[in-house]
Design a protein with these regions (language model features):
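Conserved ABC ATPase "signature" region
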Residues: 90-108, 217-218
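Conserved ABC ATPase signature
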Residues: 113-117, 121
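A short, proline-enriched helix->beta-strand linker immediately N-terminal to the Walker B motif
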Residues: 132-136
Length: 234
């Protein structure tokens, strides 16, 4: 639904990344359709795909590998604005500074290269770049899995804040159910390329029904040994 965060969970190889990359138009599925704004992304020509990508942006798992190491932060964030020819260089520079402030990066760092930032800061650059075109949908492909726990919390809180401010719809992919529980309104569980369960985040954790979902929940680490010993085994 518009304005919600839909979590997509499943083990490695379940098809999560393939699905999200298909929605982004980065890979073409062998069959089926993906509709956005009454247009089939799978069968869209380059012109339509270019227009669709303006409204659907993506944050990748690796905050370093997804950034061009030859560009400074300001150029990286401005790249979508340049590619779509939406504003002059002066206006783009101003917009970049606004985006850096939005993702809680010091605009004074605008001329730093990716290697001069921490992992969490690099992911904030990726988020700023994804927001440059003011998309309607933000695809998040394991955006915090490469970060340590404290930085994960900071980035998740940032995404929640941005979602509220911009009325964004998010598809948040993760293998970590604790992370998804924190950020998602609803959760879809994927196994072998199929959605096997779809419920509100609260219901998934309190009233899961599918055996695969129960198995994922059972795999969440619990620090209390007395509780750990009572886990269900499959």
């Amino acid at each position: 639904y518009k304005g919600e965060v839909l979590g997509l969970v499943g083990q490695s190889g379940s098809g999560k990344s393939t699905l999200i990359r298909s929605i982004a138009g980065l890979v073409k599925p062998e069959s089926g359709s993906i509709y956005y704004d009454n247009r089939d992304i799978v069968r869209a020509d380059q012109k339509d795909l270019h227009a669709i990508r303006r409204k659907i942006q993506m944050i990748f798992q690796d905050p370093y590998g997804s950034l061009n190491s030859r560009f400074v932060a300001g150029r990286i964030i401005a790249e979508p604005l340049i590619n779509y020819g939406l504003m002059s260089s002066a206006d783009a520079f101003k917009r970049v500074r606004e985006l850096m402030e939005l993702v809680r990066l010091d605009p004074a760092w605008i001329n730093r290269y990716p290697h001069e930032f921490s992992g969490g800061q690099r992911q904030r650059i990726s988020i700023a770049r994804a927001l440059a075109l003011e998309p309607e949908i933000l695809l998040c492909d394991e955006p915090v899995s490469a970060l340590d726990v404290l930085i994960q919390a900071d980035v998740l809180n940032l995404l929640k804040d941005i979602r509220s401010r911009m009325d964004l719809t998010m598809l948040f992919v993760s293998h970590d159910l604790a992370v998804v529980r924190y950020i998602a309104d609803r959760v879809a569980v994927m196994n072998k390329g199929e959605i096997v369960e779809l419920k509100s985040a609260a219901e998934i954790y309190s009233n899961a029904e599918h055996p695969y979902t129960l198995q994922l929940l059972d795999a969440i680490p619990i620090p209390d040994p007395s509780i750990e010993s009572k886990r269900i085994s499959f």
